[in-house]
């Protein structure tokens, strides 16, 4: 293997940074949402009244939430659901049954846009000037000194780069002052009034970013086509301040403070650095200095300063007005400073103050604030999220602008947070790398009536490991009240000046959660609970799942990940030659039952030449002979009409309308409705149903419309004249129903009264109006043109010329913009030649348009091409100014009514393309059966199912598409939903092998994630996991922090000499009554129960006090006594007793009990103490390889003893061991990797070669490509290197040195590689491959793979990769080649070969338009189909789960 491909399969989920701001709208836009709903506050005495609880007293304009996870940037909108006043009966039960707080019954995060960047986000802020009609700008900082500003562009419904600032390269080399390595990347902060921003780069270089004057904006002004209702803050220029020239040598933090005419920057710096071991001589070494920034004069005089701050000060918090000033956060104290006053608060007994200081107030409880995250809930209350997961409230008690004191109170518990931000005045967000990130609503004065209802539920902390894995996945309404209780916060012994009372009354409700599976320390590969032992081929991979060690401390969990869905099977029957299935409802009258809970009445099965009908009652019973359905031929489509009172069955030559089982009308189709009855019947190719209309596409390409009459429940046939006179052939068509009393598409009309964000609820009682304008017909012609018509008038309201090309933006051609015309001209010159290759071959075969539930939801448009490509578009509304619209004359067939055509068109309707990871690359016949089936409730989820050779679920969660393939049954011919007594919100599908299966989605999994995930709370930190296949057990190392009395801890160390060297004051009587937190380790053996998917701890192996389990592995050893192989559980441990005690550890071996009735699942068969920490174990040809300290020993097993037979001295500390045949690969913590071989004849471990460089290894593994063996290592600088052993090459120093085959910067710490055999693809002749890819997990929660590829594929894709660097505009202006270069972090390194393909960059090729794809492929000398075939082969070959 000379070449490899790097591919991310599950993107990072651990939140590093978060911020809130009005990015997609201005405060004045958002205020329009709440003007009608917001009621003014009542008098003071009315706070506890029942009426005050149900009305929104504090809900104001809600800003956006911006979240960064490694290189993933996401922008969310907070969607709050207000409770109906006076119990209004029209509200949906799901939206008001949640706990009501401040008039809000529920809230959720809805995705606006997201991007995967070519660089990790080091810091983030939102630049806002506070103006009512101005939007905020997102400022991102990247290594080493790159800053990018992004603002939201309504024209594309996404972020656009407004400015870039780079201080790298030769001209800025002097800024580093000779240094090559920096502990932190740039840190960026914003002025509260948006006048400027500041970024600290290279440790001591302050970059000042000057904001432009009001009205200057890239999006708002420079683009003539964009007319925004509000412009965003924009950076005009930047300049540098050298802090070294200001006598600063060690800057810790900085912040802009409030209340000054000019921006004032306060910098926390250390004059003379010290550390904890020298605090007796140097303790108060920090100080703060406030600089007034004059950007015009580029001057920055010091206006005030404060010295003698503790050395452990690490963070500044600017206090909001009217107080102003700054809080200095230290590990053991909090200090407030302003230009005129100061005060402090001691947090524990470790805090100290300079001599002569006034008396300092102390906190009522002991706490440490190092590594705490903070955000302001109001102008005088700041919330801290501590390193232990506690939430603390600090109240700044003030009189006027004079701060009198600081009061700290305990609040609830929360997740271990990595970032915190307030969102408006009702929410805050806890971002976490170690647990699920939470959206929390808070309220100061919740009424007693509300709190009584909430406190009756079980009490719980605000933690991410409550049952969120199953519940927090859909619209968080009624499910949230079960997992979070809200109770009034009460604090004892607190005096109540200013807002102290409100701090006491703060109540919380967790409203939503973002699932996080990071950090992935280790994972194992095992069988699922519902695995099929008879599965063959690629479908067999759906039997497996990843069981991962996630989280830390109380947020620790076992994350069970599945790349594909394997449904829970209820029943299965053989049904050959099935062509389609449908379920229909039947109502004899309009009942009060909600539509979502109504059971299906009939199952219609279309066979090759007949139709079966089954009743879906308690049992599926065939009623084909007793119903009036047309059963003598196959059915084309079936569905409900007239409010589910009738069933429509469409077959080849006609259609029937049925009332239950009785036919009420039969229609026969002819070529045209106007022709005589003697006309020859015309066959129906496909049909689309949208009550009360049925659209028919005939075999000859014509279109007919069946129009329903609600009064008589009958249909009439209409052939639209616009298509009769048209010469264009129709390739695909569908109907779209714009549901609700406020149809979404109607708001995009040019003559509609538009108000940003009309917030009426969607009608949920089934009585929505049947306005004809709610139904639209979408037609795509063979030429590629797409048109949207009103039904039944068939007046064209939207038209796009080249839909099948997959442009990034779809705009009505009647109101095309100037810049789009100019863009199109770039490709006109190449279209003629390129169209010869693909223009005639690429066709649309199926269309679908659907708007799923949700008050703010928008329609999705899907187009399936005949090569398997699924085009996905999301609709949005954009109102362009009249002066920027270029009128384009319509074609004669473009509209039936030219009079007033401009006013009737959906001129404000646009679609932006959404990336969707569908790997199917199959040739789909033009007249094949439908592949797309939409669903509104399958297991509580909504979306669509894509049948075919590579079936996939496309679930709509938070207005985001989540793609989950279903490969367990091979190709799927037909799919439909089923809801009855025995199958609640399930589904039915028919496989290509002729089996009909009734299934449900596994309820234990959360599908609102990159992969379906189940999180099993451990309430401890998981470290390592392994899999015992014979009994499907998962041994797992878990550590739990335990608080013990200090005297008990010391007594356990009595046999160690360290206890005699302790100072007398440490072992005094008072000190011995203190407590000490120690981590207690144990090995839990977990089993996945077959029914329900619940995990149970079958056995626990406790470790001794101060004994840390470092490794657990299943090993197969050859018993030299019995001459048999034994499968044992091997555990390696280390005693952690401080630096003064010699390291030692133990090796433990356990056997598994075969009997099911045995009380002891495992039995200890061997235990021996080692002189060093046992960090890794592995089995090598029946021997046990043990890494103990700086030595590797190979041992043979006699059944009772381990006997050493060979050893090798490692440099420092072994972090990983890998075995292939008789070869050994191990990674050292500082000295890179070593390649050994085991020779049984001479009983020796001999060194073959090693890497002579310095490398801090994280993980190692072998990469196998046929007969070629490569060695892979990940390091502490987030790189991956591939080495190979070539003793015959001169560069290898006679075979002593491992040579570099490839190197690559991943951007994350990879902690585990797992070698898995690649799957065969259609291009390979043999059924089995001898290629093995490496599946890896990283600390950011990402999962990916490194796969070997052949040279021809590599050359082709490398050429494409180099072309895409220039051909694709990259978000934030980041260079992908620069990001993927090896990062040596200042160490000497010789660049290696560039032999890895970056699929993160290559995936942007599929998002190019068809013309651009053909153009790029032609320029690199290949074809589009060949490139997409290579993509598909690699995706199929790495579908391990």
From Swiss-Prot:
| Record-level Gene Ontology MF annotations | RNA binding
Keyword Nucleus among record annotations: yes
Q: Please classify the protein's predominant subcellular localization into one broad category.
A: nucleus
Name the InterPro entries for this protein: Beta-prop_RSE1/DDB1/CPSF1_1st, Cleavage/polyA-sp_fac_asu_C, RSE1/DDB1/CFT1/CPSF1, WD40/YVTN_repeat-like_dom_sf
Q: Which residues cross the membrane?
A: none
Decide whether keyword Nucleus is in the record. Answer: yes
Cellular component terms, GO, for this chain's entry? nucleus
Domain of life of the organism encoding this protein: Eukaryota
What UniProt keywords apply to this chain's record, in alphabetical order?
mRNA processing, Nucleus, RNA-binding
According to its UniProt record, where is this protein located? Nucleus
- Provide the GO biological process annotations: mRNA processing
Q: What does this protein do?
A: CPSF plays a key role in pre-mRNA 3'-end formation, recognizing the AAUAAA signal sequence and interacting with poly(A)polymerase and other factors to bring about cleavage and poly(A) addition. This subunit is involved in the RNA recognition step of the polyadenylation reaction.
Q: How does it assemble?
A: CPSF is a heterotetramer composed of four distinct subunits 160, 100, 70 and 30 kDa.
Which PANTHER family does its entry note?
DNA REPAIR/RNA PROCESSING CPSF FAMILY
Q: Which family does it belong to?
A: Belongs to the CPSF1 family.
User: What is the protein's name according to its record?
Assistant: Probable cleavage and polyadenylation specificity factor subunit 1
User: Which source organism?
Assistant: Oryza sativa subsp. japonica
């Amino acid at each position: 293997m000379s070449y490899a491909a790097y591919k991310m399969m599950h993107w990072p989920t651990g939140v590093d940074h978060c911020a809130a701001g009005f990015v997609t709208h201005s405060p004045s836009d958002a205020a329009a949402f709440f003007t009608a709903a917001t009621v003014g506050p009542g008098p003071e005495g009315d706070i506890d009244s029942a009426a005050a609880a149900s009305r929104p007293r504090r809900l104001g304009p809600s800003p956006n939430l911006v979240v960064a996870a490694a290189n993933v940037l996401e922008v969310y909108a907070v969607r709050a659901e207000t409770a109906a006043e006076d119990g209004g009966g029209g509200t949906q039960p799901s939206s008001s049954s949640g706990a009501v707080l401040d008039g809000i019954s529920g809230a959720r995060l809805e995705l606006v846009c997201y991007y995967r960047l070519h660089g990790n986000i080091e810091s983030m802020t939102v630049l806002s000037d506070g103006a009512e009609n101005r939007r905020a700008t997102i400022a991102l900082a990247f290594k080493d000194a790159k800053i990018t500003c992004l603002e939201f562009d309504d024209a594309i419904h996404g972020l656009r780069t407004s400015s870039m600032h780079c201080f790298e390269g030769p001209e800025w080399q002097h800024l580093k002052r000779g240094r090559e390595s920096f502990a932190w990347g740039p840190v960026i902060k914003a002025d509260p009034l948006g006048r400027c921003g500041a970024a600290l780069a290279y440790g001591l270089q302050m970059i000042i970013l000057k904001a432009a004057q009001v009205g200057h904006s890239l999006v708002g002004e420079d683009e003539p086509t964009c007319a925004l209702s509000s412009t965003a803050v924009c950076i005009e220029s930047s300049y540098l301040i050298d802090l070294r020239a200001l006598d600063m040598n060690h800057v810790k933090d900085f912040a802009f403070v409030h209340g000054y005419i000019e921006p004032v920057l306060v910098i926390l710096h250390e004059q003379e650095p010290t550390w904890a071991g020298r605090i007796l001589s140097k303790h108060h070494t920090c100080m703060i200095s406030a600089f007034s920034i004059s950007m015009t004069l580029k001057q920055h005089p010091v206006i005030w300063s404060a010295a003698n701050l503790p050395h452990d000060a690490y963070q500044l918090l600017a206090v909001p007005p009217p107080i102003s000033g700054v809080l200095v956060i230290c590990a053991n104290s909090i200090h407030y400073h302003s230009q005129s006053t100061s005060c402090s608060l001691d947090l524990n007994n470790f805090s100290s103050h300079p001599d002569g200081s006034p008396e300092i107030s102390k906190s009522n409880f002991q706490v440490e604030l190092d590594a705490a995250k903070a955000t302001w809930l109001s102008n005088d209350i700041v919330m801290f999220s501590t390193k232990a997961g506690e939430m603390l409230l600090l109240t700044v008690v003030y009189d006027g602008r004079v701060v009198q004191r600081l009061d700290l109170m305990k609040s609830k518990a929360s997740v271990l947070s990595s970032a915190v931000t307030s969102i408006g005045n009702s929410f805050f967000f806890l971002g976490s790398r170690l647990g699920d990130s939470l959206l929390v609503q808070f309220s100061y004065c919740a009424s007693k009536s509300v709190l009584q209802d909430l406190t009756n539920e079980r009490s719980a902390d605000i933690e991410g490991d409550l049952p969120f894995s199953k519940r927090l996945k859909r619209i968080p309404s009624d499910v949230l009240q079960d997992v979070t209780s809200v109770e009034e916060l009460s604090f004892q012994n607190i005096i109540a000046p200013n807002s102290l009372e409100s701090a006491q009354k703060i109540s919380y409700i967790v409203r939503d959660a973002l699932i996080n599976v990071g950090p992935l320390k280790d994972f194992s590969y095992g069988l699922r609970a519902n695995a099929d032992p008879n599965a063959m081929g690629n479908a067999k991979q759906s039997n497996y799942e990843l069981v991962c060690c996630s989280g830390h401390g109380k947020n620790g969990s076992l994350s069970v990940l599945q790349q594909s869905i394997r449904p829970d099977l209820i029943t299965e029957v053989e049904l050959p030659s099935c062509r389609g299935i449908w379920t229909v409802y039947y109502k004899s009258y309009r009942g009060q039952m909600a539509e979502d809970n109504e059971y299906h009445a009939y199952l219609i099965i279309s066979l090759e030449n007949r139709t079966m009908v089954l009743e879906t009652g308690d049992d599926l019973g065939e009623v084909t002979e007793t119903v009036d359905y047309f059963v003598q031929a196959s059915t084309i489509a079936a569905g409900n009409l007239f409010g589910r009172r009738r069933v429509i069955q469409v077959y080849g030559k006609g259609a029937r309308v049925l009332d239950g089982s009785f036919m009420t009308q039969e229609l026969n189709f002819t070529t045209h409705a106007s022709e005589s009855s003697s006309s020859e019947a015309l066959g129906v190719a496909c049909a689309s149903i949208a009550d009360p209309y049925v659209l028919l596409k005939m075999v000859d390409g014509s279109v007919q419309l069946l129009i329903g009459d609600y009064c008589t429940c009958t249909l009439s046939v209409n052939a639209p004249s616009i298509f009769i006179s048209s010469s264009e052939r129709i390739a695909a068509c569908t109907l779209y129903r714009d549901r609700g009393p406020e149809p979404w598409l109607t708001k995009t009309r040019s003559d509609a009264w538009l108000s940003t964000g009309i917030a009426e609820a969607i009608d949920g009682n089934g009585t929505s109006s049947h306005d004809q304008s709610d139904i639209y017909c979408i037609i795509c012609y063979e030429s590629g043109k797409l048109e949207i018509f009103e039904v039944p008038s068939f007046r064209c309201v939207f038209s796009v010329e080249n839909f099948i090309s997959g442009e990034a933006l779809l705009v009505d051609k009647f109101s095309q913009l100037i810049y789009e015309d100019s863009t199109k001209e770039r490709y006109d010159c190449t279209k003629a030649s390129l169209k010869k290759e693909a223009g005639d071959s690429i066709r649309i075969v199926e269309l679908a348009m659907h708007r799923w539930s949700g008050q703010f939801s928008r329609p999705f448009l899907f187009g399936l091409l005949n090569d398997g490509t699924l085009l996905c578009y999301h609709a949005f509304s954009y109102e362009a100014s009249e002066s920027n619209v270029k009128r384009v004359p319509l074609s004669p067939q473009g509209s039936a009514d030219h009079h007033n055509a401009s006013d009737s068109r959906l001129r404000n309707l646009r679609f932006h393309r959404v990336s969707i990871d569908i790997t199917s690359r199959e040739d789909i016949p033009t007249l094949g059966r439908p592949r797309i089936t939409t669903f509104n409730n399958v297991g509580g989820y909504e979306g669509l199912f894509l049948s075919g050779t590579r079936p996939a679920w496309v679930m709509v969660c938070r207005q985001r598409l989540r793609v989950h393939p279903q490969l367990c049954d091979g190709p799927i011919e037909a799919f439909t939903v089923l809801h009855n007594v025995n199958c609640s919100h399930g589904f039915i599908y028919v496989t290509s092998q002729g089996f009909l299966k009734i299934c449900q989605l596994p309820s234990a999994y959360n599908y609102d994630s990159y992969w379906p995930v189940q999180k099993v709370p451990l309430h401890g930190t998981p470290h390592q996991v392994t899999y015992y296949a014979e009994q499907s057990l998962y041994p797992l190392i878990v550590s739990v922090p335990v608080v013990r009395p200090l005297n008990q801890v010391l007594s356990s160390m009595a046999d160690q000499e360290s206890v005699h060297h302790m100072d007398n004051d440490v072992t005094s009587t008072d000190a011995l009554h203190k407590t000490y937190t120690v981590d207690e380790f144990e090995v839990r053996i977990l089993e996945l129960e077959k029914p329900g998917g619940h995990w149970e701890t079958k056995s626990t192996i406790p470790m001794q006090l101060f004994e840390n389990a470092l490794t657990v592995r299943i090993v197969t050893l050859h018993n030299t006594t019995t001459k048999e192989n034994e499968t044992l559980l091997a555990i390696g441990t280390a005693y952690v007793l401080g630096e003064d005690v010699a390291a030692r550890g133990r090796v433990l071996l356990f056997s598994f009990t075969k009997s099911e009735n045995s009380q002891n699942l495992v039995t200890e068969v061997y235990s021996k103490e080692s002189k060093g920490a046992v960090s890794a174990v592995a089995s090598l040809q029946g021997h046990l390889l043990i890494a103990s300290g700086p030595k590797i020993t190979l041992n043979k097993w006699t059944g009772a003893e381990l006997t050493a037979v060979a050893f090798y001295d490692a440099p420092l500390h072994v972090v990983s061991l890998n075995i292939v045949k008789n070869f050994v690969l191990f990674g050292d913590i500082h000295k890179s990797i070593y390649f050994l071989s085991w020779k049984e004849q001479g009983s020796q471990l001999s060194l073959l070669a090693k890497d002579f460089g310095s490398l801090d290894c994280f993980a190692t593994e072998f990469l196998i490509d046929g007969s070629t063996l490569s060695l892979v290592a990940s390091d502490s600088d987030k790189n991956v290197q591939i080495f190979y052993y070539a003793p015959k090459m001169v560069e290898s120093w006679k075979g002593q040195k491992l040579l570099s085959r490839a190197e690559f910067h991943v951007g994350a710490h990879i902690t585990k590689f797992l070698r898995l055999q690649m799957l065969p693809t259609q291009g390979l002749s043999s059924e089995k491959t001898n290629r093995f890819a490496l599946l890896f997990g990283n600390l950011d929660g990402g999962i990916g793979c490194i796969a070997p590829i052949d040279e021809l594929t590599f050359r082709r894709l490398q050429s494409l990769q180099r072309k895409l660097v220039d051909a694709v505009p990259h978000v934030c202006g980041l260079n992908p080649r620069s990001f993927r270069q090896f990062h040596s972090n200042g160490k000497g390194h010789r660049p290696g070969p560039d032999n890895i393909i970056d699929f993160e960059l290559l995936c942007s090729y599929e998002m190019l338009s068809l013309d651009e794809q053909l153009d790029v492929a032609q320029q690199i000398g290949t074809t589009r189909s060949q490139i997409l075939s290579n993509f598909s082969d690699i995706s199929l070959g790495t579908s391990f789960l």
